[in-house]
Swiss-Prot record:
It comes from the Eukaryota. It comes from Bothrops pictus (Desert lancehead). Monomer. One of its GO terms (cellular component) is secretory granule. One of its GO terms (biological process) is proteolysis. This is Snake venom serine protease pictobin. Residues 1-11 form the signal peptide. Its EC number is 3.4.21.-. CDD domains: Tryp_SPc. Expressed by the venom gland. Glycans are attached at N71, N95, N146, N162, N243. GO terms for molecular function: serine-type endopeptidase activity; toxin activity. Belongs to the peptidase S1 family. Snake venom subfamily. Disulfide bonds join C24-C155, C42-C58, C134-C202, C166-C181, C192-C217.
């Protein structure tokens, strides 16, 4: 499987790119962050002026976070670069397995300003519904198994399935999980290496974080797993509110 990380050939999508998509509209990803560290990159989501939500497996010692980026070869006047001031990792063990905790909150070294190309994406108010059409995006590879990385982010629509679909596709998954299963059953469209940490947006709400998938990406009947943002809301909001010792949901 593919963790979707640029440097890992395991089951995580730390660096997946969208396969089967098209270049994102320049105005549809104002919240999309690009995290970079010595050739390794991931996606992330700006959830307010001071916080970015991404995947734990995207963590690196030296990270530079770009906001307002579209074409990596062209710098917008309002592009902003930040560095992590604090990082928070989901600490819960009770009722959470290793599959449920690939989520990281990054506090930026200074707030970003809303602009033409930068604006946060709200956290979800409700969990997503199976059958929803969801949007994925990132600078991950657009081909598999051989990687091709674009200068611009690609976007695609995929479908949200019952978790049992992913459990049937991959051996070793737990019976239940706080992850979302999404993809296209006929294959050809998927997140992939380089897309890890980026958002899964269902019906306009930020519902998932790119986590794990098949290797190679975009194979038939091999949807990917996304960390379920809604199931981590208590922890996210507690940390942002200043309760840095927040542990598990009640």
């Amino acid at each position: 499987a593919n963790l979707l990380i640029l440097q890992v050939s395991y089951a995580q999508k730390s660096s997946e790119l969208v396969i089967g998509g098209d270049e994102c509209n320049i105005n549809e990803h104002r919240f999309l962050a690009f995290t970079y560290s010595r050739g390794f990159f991931c996606g992330g989501t700006l959830i307010n002026q001071e916080w970015v939500l991404t995947a734990t497996h995207c963590d690196r010692i030296f990270m530079r976070i770009y906001l307002g980026l579209h074409n990596q070869s062209v710098r917008y006047d309002d592009q902003q670069i930040r560095y992590p001031k604090e990082k928070y990792f989901f600490p819960c063990s009770k009722n959470f397995t290793k599959w449920d905790k690939d989520i990281m909150l990054i506090r930026l070294d200074r707030p970003v300003k809303n602009s033409e190309h930068i604006a946060p994406l709200s956290l979800p108010s409700n969990p997503p519904s199976v059958g929803s059409v969801c949007r994925v995006m990132g600078w991950g590879t657009i081909t598999a198994p051989n990687d091709t990385y674009p200068d611009v982010p690609h976007c695609a629509n995929i479908n949200l399935f019952n978790y049992t679909v992913c459990r049937g596709a991959y051996k070793g998954l737990p019976a239940t999980s706080r992850t979302l299963c999404a993809g296209v059953l006929q294959g050809g469209i998927d997140t992939c290496v380089g897309d890890s940490g980026g958002p899964l947006i269902c019906n306009g709400q930020f519902q998932g974080i790119v986590f794990w998938g098949g290797d190679p990406c975009a194979q038939p009947r091999k949807p990917a797993l996304y960390t379920k943002v809604f199931d981590h809301l208590h922890w996210i909001l507690s940390i942002i509110a200043g309760n840095t010792t927040a542990t598990c949901p009640p």
